[in-house]
Amino acid sequence: MVTIRADEISNIIRERIEQYNREVKIVNTGTVLQVGDGIARIHGLDEVMAGELVEFEEGTIGIALNLESNNVGVVLMGDGLTIQEGSSVKATGRIAQIPVSEAYLGRVINALAKPIDGRGEISASESRLIESPAPGIISRRSVYEPLQTGLIAIDSMIPIGRGQRELIIGDRQTGKAAVATDTILNQKGQNVVCVYVAIGQKASSVAQVVTTFQERGAMEYTIVVAETADSPATLQYLAPYTGAALAEYFMYRERHTSIIYDDLSKQAQAYRQMSLLLRRPPGREAYPGDVFYLHSRLLERAAKLSSPLGEGSMTALPIVETQSGDVSAYIPTNVISITDGQIFLSADLFNAGIRPAINVGISVSRVGSAAQIKAMKQVAGKSKLELAQFAELEAFAQFASDLDKATQNQLARGQRLRELLKQSQAAPLTVEEQIVTIYTGANGYLDPLEIGQVKKFLVQLRTYLKTNKPQLQEIISSTKTFTEEVEALLKEAIPEQIELFLLQEQT
């Protein structure tokens, strides 16, 4: 028979008591009352904060947006098909944040910063809040460096500076995304990090943009954040903030960044859907009352930082789609009032074969010539006025039968100026090439040519100057001014090339 030793038993009990670790954990929980259409109503969660992340029993994450007296309205970051009525929900005590690092360059990610390009996980040691406060007044300085888009019409007449917010607005299929993607292609070698945010786009068009970037070597300095048309409204609403958080990470590390939101109309629609399902009162065009704040807090994050903060910059190029040219609708007027200018793309110009279809008359940059190098100011200073006068004269000339010689000359000059602003897609020009092109048109050298010959001649002229007069490019890029030496070189080269071109065309 086994003998029971009292001292041994007491030792074991004592050891167990010493090892006992009482862990007290307070968890803020609730139960699902109702779920559907990407919205869940939760009973409980008494201590939850506005904007806090909550986790459902089966792993779905949501954001608490509506805090009501008897329930909490949560928007889901997923389809929520496996969430059941009565299942439990717990508050996480965190607000939405994403990992950030250099490793994101060249990758395609979703609004939660998870890779969707099939190239494995992205390593990151730091994280940033998706919603960060914008830099204050003291943290900023005025915009003074140009961000070259490679498009003559923009860089000469509607210049964009680093740290500016310039709206690209127009009807569907007028080339808005083409202007934005060309700007990204033109940043090659400029040490600018680009972020392209696709909101509610077709997956095929996002894939096309990514392919273009890869073929042109632009992906190495670009991050693509994509939430396509089949994504939940919550993720389409979050995508721009995710892009802004990534761009901010580089801006605060003394880098220049450029971010494109394509497009904010779809983000506003996603937010409207969420708000109406949460039963928030609708306002104008059924958008909620805080839709202005939705965009202002996003676009205010673009800035040119002051010297103590390292002079980094974040340039925002939001895109907004209009319905049959109506710029006075709710979202377009909101975004126009927030940004520092707009580039208006016209369907009529696009259909008339003027591409990029920029309506120079009503497009404006509120930073102006501060965002141009001196050489461009010297050459293109009067271009916008001349084109506006030409457009007015052209409209008037339709009703007049016999025009005097001076008017005919002005019309001919204007037509050639408009012709030199035409550019093929994905063919950005360097600032030196743009200066030469504008100088040629503004000084009447193109007048002897037929309108149809202008584009062909300019290509030939640029090629000739690149190979035979490389010092021209060197002088402009080193001095940033249009010197007398440059003008002398052009006065000699352009007439020669025009003679040669006209002889070639005759044969």
Swiss-Prot record:
Pfam families: ATP-synt_ab, ATP-synt_ab_C, ATP-synt_ab_N. InterPro entries: ATP_synth_asu-like_sf, ATP_synth_asu_C, ATP_synth_asu_C_sf, ATP_synth_F1_a_nt-bd_dom, ATP_synth_F1_asu, ATPase_a/bsu_AS, ATPase_F1/V1/A1_a/bsu_N, ATPase_F1/V1/A1_a/bsu_N_sf. One of its GO terms (molecular function) is ADP binding. It is a peripheral membrane protein. GO terms for cellular component: chloroplast thylakoid membrane; proton-transporting ATP synthase complex. The keyword Plastid applies. It is an enzyme of class 7 (translocase). Keywords: ATP synthesis, ATP-binding, CF(1), Chloroplast, Hydrogen ion transport, Ion transport, Membrane, Nucleotide-binding, Plastid, Thylakoid, Translocase, Transport. It comes from the Eukaryota. Coiled coil: none annotated. The record marks 363 as: Required for activity. ATP binds at residues 170-177. The keyword Ribonucleoprotein does not apply. It is found in: Plastid, Chloroplast thylakoid membrane. Its EC number is 7.1.2.2. It catalyses: ATP + H2O + 4 H(+)(in) = ADP + phosphate + 5 H(+)(out). NCBIfam families: atpA, PRK13343.1. F-type ATPases have 2 components, CF(1) - the catalytic core - and CF(0) - the membrane proton channel. CF(1) has five subunits: alpha(3), beta(3), gamma(1), delta(1), epsilon(1). CF(0) has four main subunits: a, b, b' and c. Produces ATP from ADP in the presence of a proton gradient across the membrane. The alpha chain is a regulatory subunit. Belongs to the ATPase alpha/beta chains family. This is ATP synthase subunit alpha, chloroplastic. It comes from Calycanthus floridus var. glaucus. The lineage of its organism: Eukaryota, Viridiplantae, Streptophyta, Embryophyta, Tracheophyta.
